[in-house]
Amino acid sequence: MYDIAIIGCGVIGAAAAYALSRYDNRVVILEAENDVADCTTKANSAILHAGYDPAPGTRMARLNVRGVALAKEICAKLDVSYKQCGSLVLALDEKELPHLQHLFENGTANGVPGMKILSREETLAMEPSLSEKVCGALWAPSAAIVNPWEYALAMTEVAVRNGVELRRSCKVTDAEAIEGGYRLTVPGGTVETRCVINAAGIWADKVHSMVEPANFRIIPTRGEYYLLDKSEGTRVSHVIFQCPNALGKGVLVAPTVHGNLLVGPNAEPVEGNDTSCTSSGLEFVKTTAQRSVPSINF
């Protein structure tokens, strides 16, 4: 029997394996895909958020701020591509300025270091390509960009070298509680373990409902991006956000660690693992991003 089975080897499963590999445990990772970091971890905004957005006092607030600091340490230790470029949340009209103050107060309560509310002039001095409609911005210097696929892979490699077993193409199709732990059904047999870490991403609710009542549901959200040529990579030097809304942090414009420019995403609820791109979605991303940085050459 294993001590711990980790279901899923995206960035969360990889980080769990990396941390647990320091201890004398028998750990196995069960990854449904044929490689690690093959789902959400390989296709996202690649940003380590500063932590001003979560509500103060929540677990998310505490872990966000602690996590961005830990990620910096891990990337340095494992030689993972990382750049602490900081982020700017823009107010594109006077009505959005109070929201910057709200985020600043959130971040202060959460312990986000070095934040500052910038004037219009200070904002444009930092990013001359921004829209002339900018009224101010929230500056968060601890935000960073990373290669998330490389990050997850590096942590997994260390975990495996330290004795963690990695099983790829090993989808968990059922689970049951047994005396002293759980029995997981996988291709070709079963795995017995004392503990389970559910890091199954958008399928985590289905894994949960194998052994517990289905008391929550994950609704996957598809995001569409433009990844632009390196000729656009210096268009901005920081992660550029608009004021967040109910669907999330909105369409961003950001450099990548490889020198490209990343623009997006939108947020469309979908069924299952729908990763298609649509002309309407990309047009929305383009139009929305140009509110922040009108000169982007799409």
PLM-predicted stretches and their roles:
Residues 2-29:
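N-terminal Rossmann-like FAD-binding beta1-loop-alpha1 element of flavoenzymes
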Residues 12, 35, 203:
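Conserved Rossmann-like nucleotide-cofactor binding loop
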Residues 18-22, 48, 78-83, 181, ...:
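Active-site substrate-recognition segment that forms the wall
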Residues 21-43:
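Glycine-rich FAD pyrophosphate-binding loop
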Residues 31, 84, 119-120, 168-170, ...:
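Short loop/edge segments at beta-strand edges and connector loops
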Residues 46-126, 135, 250-251:
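Dinucleotide-binding Rossmann-like beta1-alpha1 core, especially the glycine-rich loop
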Residues 138-195:
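Helical element adjacent to the flavin cofactor pocket in flavoenzyme catalytic cores
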